[in-house]
Amino acid sequence: SFMYGAGSFFSIGERNSISYGYAFSDSKGNQNSTDTTADETNAIGHSFTLGHDFIVNELITTNISLGFSDTDAKIDAGNDYETYDASFGINFAFPWAYIAVTNGYSFNDYKKADSSVSTGRLRSDVANTFDIMVTKAIGDIFPAIDPNRSFFINLSYEKIQSEGNILNYDYITDSFSLSFSRSFNLN
């Protein structure tokens, strides 16, 4: 499997920026004796994104994004679909932490019916994703360990609620994550 993508942004005045992107993916399933249908899910995907960021003030920024993706699988039934995404986020750059809150919706429309689940019915799902992330520089807590404040701890919570026209695809998930990241300059 592989994925390629490109994107960029441009500013409009001092408080607005527009971002855009394209990604291509070619995913390959690992077909073996325990998964004899993996080859059928091999898919080519194209996705496009467009976003707008706005600086409200030194503390608050907002972002709105739209996306479209099209996935075409080797075997169509239940694997070919289009996704339409829309999300809104608000970010707070507090002196003590960076907090990002985002709420988004994804609409999935499948192109052919999956006969293994429901004959003749085209699957259609909507998923609501809410997440909150808190980021803090380790150097703010332990200056001796990270004097440049380039090592971060990230805590996040995500809730996904999906509803489909086929009951098998309704679900609610909650997830928490803890991660560490480091920033550096290449010049």
Residue ranges and their predicted role:
Residues 1-187:
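Gram-negative and organellar
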